[in-house]
Swiss-Prot record:
Protein name: Phenylcoumaran benzylic ether reductase POP1
Keyword Oxidoreductase: yes
Active site: 131 (proton acceptor)
Presence of keyword Oxidoreductase: yes
Source taxonomy: Eukaryota, Viridiplantae, Streptophyta, Embryophyta, Tracheophyta
Length: 306
């Protein structure tokens, strides 16, 4: 029997992909929503899609303990996809899971770098630390978990090539942080969702980090630019920003540019997606666990922009 799954933050950016994957995989799927979300015009398309997929809405709020406990008691698994501002509030979910006493597994809001293995500067450093603190709280309470480290969303990073404010890949020049040699990992949101849902009832992912690092999506920035150049039949001007200059730029920038740049520093300069080995004691890799999943490669993903 497929586990019943409750989503908290299910109408958000990555949440909506995972909710859809859950429903399509045959899991009884529940989304915690506020009354106001159901009538919010900005969310109407997402809500409509969820209804068509047979998703159940449970009225409640992250800040209403009783509603959280009540919702959690109806399911087996809780997946949090809350946004940046609510990361720190996941203690509320942990407390409710603890009180409900029936949860087989909790997936906190992660879906990025492995926050226990990062070399970051502010403001990324604090964001990563918040997620790491949530991990420690889950472990301290003895709640069964899976942490999904899905690295970069293709829909953001391959669309923009990490150029702040860009809405399409570059056509003439491209700014590269550091020397462009460390490898990063780019995954399509639908694939992240598919792998996450496959992990829900898999004993191999219990109390582990699920890394989504498919070989064809692990590529250096220099190679990414070369791949793109081949596709558009044009050589781009490459502007390299040395680490020292980048650190200065981060300090001088304001939100959200400083966030984008500091995450870029962690990934593209320090190599935080790929500078460690996945040990069986703490992690497993999704494309190895689920070779049947036909994931979208970076090469395939870029074709749509040519």
């Amino acid at each position: 029997m497929a586990s019943k799954i409750l989503f908290i933050g299910g109408t958000g950016y990555i949440g909506k992909f995972i909710v859809e994957a859950s429903a399509k995989a045959g899991h009884p799927t529940f989304v915690l929503v506020r009354e106001s979300t159901l009538s919010n015009p900005a969310k109407s398309v997402v809500i409509y899609n969820f209804k068509n997929l047979g998703v159940n809405f449970l009225i409640g709020d992250l800040f209403d303990h009783e509603s959280l406990v009540k919702a959690i008691k109806q399911v087996d698994v809780v997946i949090s996809t809350v946004g940046h501002a609510q990361l720190v509030e996941q203690d509320r979910i942990i407390a409710a899971i603890k009180e409900a006493g029936n949860v087989k597994r909790f997936f906190p809001s992660e879906f990025g770098n492995d926050v226990d293995r990062v070399n970051a500067v502010e403001p990324a450093k604090s964001a990563f630390a918040t997620k790491a603190n949530v991990r420690r709280a889950i472990e301290a309470e003895g709640i069964p978990y899976t942490y999904v480290s899905s690295n970069f969303f293709s829909g953001y990073f391959l669309l923009s090539f990490n150029q702040p404010g860009a809405t399409a890949p570059p056509r003439d020049k491209v700014v590269i942080l550091g020397d462009g040699n460390p490898k990063a990992v780019f995954n399509k949101e639908d694939d992240i969702a598919t792998y996450t849902i496959k992990a829900v009832d898999d004993p191999r992912t219990l109390n582990k980090i699920l890394y989504i690092k498919p070989p064809a999506n692990t590529i250096s920035f220099n190679d990414l630019v070369s791949l793109w150049e081949k596709k558009i039949g044009k050589t781009l001007e490459r502007i390299y920003v040395p680490e020292e200059q980048l650190l200065k730029n981060i300090q001088e920038a304001s939100v959200p540019v400083n966030v984008v740049l500091s995450i870029g520093h962690s990934v593209f300069v320090k190599g935080d997606h790929t500078n460690f080995e996945i040990e069986p004691s703490f992690g497993v890799e999704a494309s190895e666990l689920y070779p049947d999943v036909k994931y979208t490669t970076v090469d395939e993903y870029l074709k749509q922009f040519v």
